[in-house]
């Protein structure tokens, strides 16, 4: 696996869990596959590169994940504003409950878990830049063209007015500005010793992800105020992140196996949920991808246990 450059690994791995293990995307549509690769791949890579270049920690990553959500679900797919779908808590033309759910899912599944897993596998290169400056700007152009161009083909109707695009651009710019200015972590003087075993970290991450996602599925259907739904969903997500922080999951010197335990715990929620997703979608695609993902994660764990030489 180490023969594959880390940038290429992250590029191709990023869309797998969010779109294919979850069953969110059709499996036999090459155009959607291309759109996903040019969306999730550059998106995760750009965020990871800014983290490395600016010498920031995971706080900057989660701030940039907000910008990613606005780009994908707002500028590209228009789900944040579509008046015909997911309209719970709609106010000022925004589907706020859906927006909250997308912030939770994408920040954890599309951005955090893939980057953390990649940095566990490529531990020796964790502080390095994975792409050259020219490649970085190529990725930015490809990502932008995909969002603004392909998005019009995938979701051409019910688009908001020009003022919404200006607000979205302002939010993305503000997130980039803020991520660049938040304090970075203190340099690791030695490898962080986790407070718990890797198995404990895996089970805790899986349990936290399970609780966060169950809340995300159940709360939107409850007969309560939309504002309360938004608050509950985001609070549970922040509580999960706080739990990970207290257990040193975000420490810069965290060892590769502990990073893997946290990332695989988050990803494994979708593996366990795949039979239900397969039933809901009426095809075996989510289950097949989940089995492949489980096998891949088992292989990665085996290699990491052998040490850097593997």
Describe the residue ranges of each PLM region.
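Hydrophobic cores of alpha-helical transmembrane segments in multi-pass inner/ER membrane proteins
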Residues: 37-48, 102-119, 167-183, 232-243, ...
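Short, hydrophobic transmembrane alpha-helix segments
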Residues: 20-30, 155-158, 219-222, 275-283
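C-terminal ends of transmembrane alpha-helices
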Residues: 18-23, 75-82, 142-159, 211-218
